[in-house]
Amino acid sequence: MWFVDSDDLPFSNYLEKALHEPQSNDADILMGSYLKMDLNGEITRITLPKYGLIDSETLPVCFMQAQYETGYFGYLWNKLLRREKILSVNAVFDESMTLAEDLQFLVQLYRANSRVLLTPHCAMQFAAHPLRREADHFKQLLLQKEIAHWVITEQKHTECKPFFRKSLSAYTAFSVFYAPDIGLDPITKAKEIMEDEALCALLSEAELHGVFRSIVHCLKQQNLPALQLHLAAYRAAKHAKSILKGENTRALHSA
C-alpha cells in the first residue's frame, strides 16, 4: 500500500524501482528518499546514509539517527507498506491527532518486528506547511512516550534515555502551557500528567527555560498551587506587556 496526500507529487517510477529491489519480497516496509520543498520554495532531497534490509533490532537505531533531524521515519508517503502487516497488527490512525498522525500509525508497525528495506529511490516531492499552533501537545507527549518505551524498554537502547528525558519534559510543559489554545484547562491537564508516575520520574527541567522550566518543576514536586501561581504570573505579565505596547503605539501615533 502507498499512501499519498492530494497535494504531494508522487514519482510513478518509484513503485517499479522499489519493487524490483532484490530483497523487496523479504520486507514489510519499503522506504525511499523524497524531495522536501520548504516554506521559501527551496528543495532538499532527504535520504539516509545506508541502504539495505534492516531487522527489528537495527530499526530503532536507524530511527533515532534520522527521525528527529529529518522526520524520515515519520512520513507515510515515501513508504510502501505490506497490507498483511497492517492487518496483522490491526494498525489504525488516531483521527483525533492534529499533528504527527503518520508517525503514530507507523510506530505501530515499527514495534511489530517489521523488516524494513531502505532504498535510494526517490518516492515523491512534498511541500512543508507551517506548524499548527492548535496542535494537541498532550497527544504528542503520549506518542513520544510510546516511542521511548519501544526504543528504551523493548529494544534496550538505554543510551537514548537522556534524549527522551529532554523530549518528554518539553512536551509535558507544552501540554500544560498550551492547553487553553485547544480549549482545555491547564490544571486539569497537569493533574492527568501527575498521575503518570513513570512519566514524572523521567521529567527534568535542566534544559528548559522560563515558564516551561517552572511547569516541569511543579509537576515533579506535585505542587499544583505553585503551578497555578506561575501560570497566573505569566499571564499577568503578558497582559501588562500587551497594554504597555498598545499605549506606546498610541503615543507614537498621537505625537
Stretches with model-predicted labels:
Residues G74-R82, L143-H149, F164-F174, C200-I215, ...:
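Short secondary-structure transition/capping segments
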Residues M37-G41, F63-Y72, I152-K161, F177-D181, ...:
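Low-complexity, flexible helical/coil segments
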Residues S6-T119, M124-K139:
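Donor-binding/catalytic cores of nucleotide-activated saccharide
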Residues S114, H121-H129, E134-K166, Y171-L199:
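Catalytic core of nucleotide-sugar-dependent glycosyltransferases
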Residues I182-A255:
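Membrane-interface aromatic/basic loop that binds lipid-linked glycans or pyrophosphate carriers
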Residues R45-I46, E69-N78, H121, K139, ...:
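Noncatalytic linker/hinge segments flanking ATPase motor cores
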